[in-house]
Each structure stands twice: as structure tokens, then as C-alpha cells.
């Protein structure tokens, strides 16, 4: 008996943990109407059951982010006219139609059939994927048809942004360039400009630093020479300046005396020669 009770507890726990059914993925193009099937079997004819549709995983009760709700026979809540039930409610068909889908409609949807009793609800989770619309073939001037295959390109610039990239091919297999090449070229140009700007800024900064260091070194050297001159003058004896001036004056007088002596010697020689010339032969 104890083992049977344990087995029942384990089964109940598994039911609680694995109550969600496997997700079924449905893919639709942008602008189309999406169809998400959901139905249940009536226990007896006319025994309809309330249900709800929500966006997100099925919670423990009701529907998260409720989109549509019914009682036994009628729709009692509808978030938008885009969400409609097109099946036969009297036969248990509660499939959801989403009109004119966009990329924001992708995600998981919950269909909850609220059968009477505890833990008796039927929960069905369906995954909706939205892809970009295909571009129709265009006829060229020479009669060659051109096909386009769209791809989704995600870029991050002040947030997440999704764009459609179209690559064109003609019958000859020639690829027609699209704006993807322009984006690539512009990106390389921007990176090159950034690198050049960083290099120029670094060079100017280095030159400025070197100039400041040179000016600082020159200023320090000039101050050092001025300090040495002041120290030399301060170490001279009290009469040193006067003695230096006197020595300079005496040197100038000696120069004048030497010049006068030379002049007198030249005059005496001339006189001697003149006297000798007066003697008889």
C-alpha cells in the first residue's frame, strides 16, 4: 500500500512538472494570417468548455498575457480584432487566427481548455515564428527574371534593430550587389577614420609632452646657472671687487706707459743720426 501511494505521488509530481505539452512550431510570413490549431473532444454533445488564449507559456491557471477568452459558447474577451476564433465552437474547435502578423508576433502561445475539476485543464503550447516576406521576381529589360532571397540582419545601434537583407540573382547566376556591400564599405571607412584620428591625437599628445619636458629642462638649467653666479659673488672677500677694479686700472696705465716709451726711443734715434751727419769727412 505504501509503495502504491509513493507511485501515485511520483506520477502526480511528474504531471505537475511535465504538464506542458511539446511545443509545435508554426512559421508564417510578415503580413499573412497566422493559424494556431487547438481543439478538444466534447464528453457529450453540447457540453462546451471555457477556454483562453494567451501569449507566453501556460501558467498554473488561466492564461498569461491573455489575448482571447470564451465561456461555454461565446467570446467574452478579445484583446484586439486581430485575434479571432474561426473554428466551430460547438464541435470544440477553438483554433486561433492572428491577422496581418508582424515580427513582434513571434513567440510562444498557450491554448488552455478549462475542464472541470482540479488539475484537469488541457494545455497546449505552440511556437509561432515570423519570417520576412519574399520579394517577387522582377522582369529585366532583356527578359531575364531576377529572384530575390531575403535574409534577416540584426544590428545593434542604440538597441536591437532587425532589417531585411535582399540578395538578387539573375538567370545567368550573376549576383547583384545590394546595400550590404555599402554597409560593409562604410563600416571599413569609419574604422579607418577612427584609427587615423587616434594616431594623430596620440602623435600630437606625444609632441606636446616632449615640448613641455624641454621647456621645463631649460627653465631648470637657467635657474641653476643663476644660482651658481649668485653663490660665486657671495663667496668673494670684502675687498675682492675693489682689488679687481684696481688691477684693471693698473693694467690700462701700463699699456699707456709702454706706448710712450716706444715713442721716445724712436725720437732719440732720429736725433743721433742727425748729429753724425754734421761731422766732416
Curated annotation (Swiss-Prot):
Changing residue 62 to A: No effect on phagocytic activity. PROSITE patterns: IG_LIKE. Glycans are attached at residues 74, 100, 146, 172. One of its GO terms (cellular component) is extracellular region. InterPro entries: Ig-like_dom, Ig-like_dom_sf, Ig-like_fold, Ig_sub, Ig_V-set, Immune_Mod/Transcr_Coactivator. Residues 1-19 form the signal peptide. Phosphorylated on tyrosine residues; modestly increased after TCR/CD28 stimulation. Can be phosphorylated in the cytoplasmic domain by FYN. Phosphorylation at Tyr-256 is increased by stimulation with ligand LGALS9. One of its GO terms (molecular function) is metal ion binding. GO terms for biological process: adaptive immune response; cellular response to lipopolysaccharide; defense response to Gram-positive bacterium; inflammatory response; innate immune response; macrophage activation involved in immune response; maternal process involved in female pregnancy; natural killer cell tolerance induction. The chain crosses the membrane at residues 194-214. Residues 139-160 are annotated as: Disordered. Residues 215-281 are cytoplasmic. Residues 252-270 are annotated as: Interaction with BAG6. Disulfide bonds join 38-111, 52-63, 58-110. Changing residue 53 to A: Greatly decreases phosphatidylserine binding. The keyword Chaperone does not apply. Belongs to the T-cell and airway phenotype regulator (Tapr) locus, a single chromosomal region that confers reduced T-helper type 2 responsiveness and protects against airway hyperactivity (AHR), the hallmark of human asthma. This is Hepatitis A virus cellular receptor 2 homolog. The gene is Havcr2.
Amino acid at each position: 500500500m505504501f509503495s502504491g501511494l509513493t507511485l501515485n505521488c511520483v506520477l502526480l509530481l511528474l504531471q505537475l512538472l511535465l504538464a506542458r505539452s511539446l511545443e509545435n512550431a508554426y512559421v508564417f510570413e510578415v503580413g499573412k494570417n497566422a493559424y494556431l490549431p487547438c481543439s478538444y473532444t466534447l464528453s457529450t454533445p453540447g457540453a462546451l468548455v471555457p477556454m483562453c488564449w494567451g501569449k507566453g507559456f501556460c501558467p498554473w491557471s488561466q492564461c498569461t498575457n491573455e489575448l482571447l477568452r470564451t465561456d461555454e459558447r461565446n467570446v467574452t474577451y478579445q484583446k484586439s480584432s486581430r485575434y479571432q476564433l474561426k473554428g466551430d465552437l460547438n464541435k470544440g474547435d477553438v483554433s486561433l487566427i492572428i491577422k496581418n502578423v508582424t515580427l513582434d508576433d513571434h513567440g510562444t502561445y498557450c491554448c488552455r481548455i478549462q475542464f472541470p475539476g482540479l488539475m484537469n485543464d488541457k494545455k497546449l503550447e505552440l511556437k509561432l515564428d515570423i519570417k520576412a516576406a519574399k520579394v517577387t521576381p522582377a522582369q529585366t529589360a532583356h527578359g531575364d527574371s531576377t529572384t530575390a532571397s531575403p535574409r534577416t540582419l540584426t544590428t545593434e545601434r542604440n538597441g536591437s534593430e532587425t532589417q531585411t537583407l535582399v540578395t538578387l540573382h539573375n538567370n545567368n547566376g550573376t549576383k547583384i550587389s545590394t546595400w550590404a556591400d555599402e554597409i560593409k564599405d562604410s563600416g571599413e571607412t569609419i574604422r579607418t577614420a577612427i584609427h587615423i584620428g587616434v594616431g594623430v591625437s596620440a602623435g600630437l599628445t606625444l609632441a606636446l609632452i616632449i615640448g613641455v619636458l624641454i621647456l621645463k629642462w631649460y627653465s631648470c638649467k637657467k635657474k641653476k646657472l643663476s644660482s651658481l653666479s649668485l653663490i660665486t659673488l657671495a663667496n668673494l672677500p670684502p675687498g675682492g671687487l675693489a682689488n679687481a677694479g684696481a688691477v684693471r686700472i693698473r693694467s690700462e696705465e701700463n699699456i699707456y706707459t709702454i706706448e710712450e716709451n716706444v715713442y721716445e726711443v724712436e725720437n732719440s734715434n732720429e736725433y743721433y743720426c742727425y748729429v753724425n751727419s754734421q761731422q766732416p769727412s
